[in-house]
Swiss-Prot record:
UniProt KW Metal-binding keyword: no
Originating organism: Mammaliicoccus sciuri (Staphylococcus sciuri)
Signal peptide per UniProt: none
Assembly and binders: Monomer and homodimer.
Modification note: Upon exposure to beta-lactams, proteolytic cleavage at a single site impairs dimerization and abolishes repressor activity.
UniProt-listed InterPro entries: BlaI_family, WH-like_DNA-bd_sf, WH_DNA-bd_sf
Any one annotated GO CC term: cytoplasm
Record-annotated site: Cleavage: N101, F102
Name of the protein in question: Methicillin resistance regulatory protein MecI
UniProt DNA-binding residue ranges: 7-71
Tagged with keyword DNA-binding: yes
A GO MF label: DNA binding
A Gene Ontology biological process term: response to antibiotic
């Protein structure tokens, strides 16, 4: 997985979030969860599952004739690598540019400012 780019579509993130939440989920479980929030057809959702499987983000095991899907990547790892790819593309690898952009444009609460200070002081 380390050699692959961590490119996941917004729709694929929704599938991954369900799999991370449930640990193991059948296609029908995933379909039910997504259809509570989205008006997507079962075929569309199965296509997303297949894409994630082919990309190597998830795997499956058969349990009583039903495939149970599970993640092959840690949620925190993929979020970090996806964020890093984004920073490299948009900010040319300049993490400080990203942070400065958000700090300057966002209204931060005192708690958020204090949390940022604490994180920076630990570095």
């Amino acid at each position: 997985m380390d050699n692959k780019t961590y490119e996941i579509s917004s729709a694929e993130w929704e599938v991954m979030n369900i799999i991370w939440m449930k640990k193991y989920a059948s296609a029908n479980n995933i379909i039910e969860e997504i259809q509570m929030q989205r008006d997507w057809s079962p075929k569309t959702i199965r296509t997303l599952i297949t894409r994630l499987y082919k990309k190597g983000f998830i795997d499956r095991k058969k349990d009583n004739k039903i495939f149970q899907y599970y993640s092959l990547v840690e949620e925190s790892d993929i979020k970090y690598k996806t964020s890093k790819n984004f920073i490299n593309k948009v900010y040319k690898g300049g993490f400080n540019s990203l942070v400065l952009n958000f700090v300057e444009k966002e209204d931060l609460s005192q708690d958020e400012i204090e949390e940022l200070r604490n994180i920076l002081n630990k570095k």
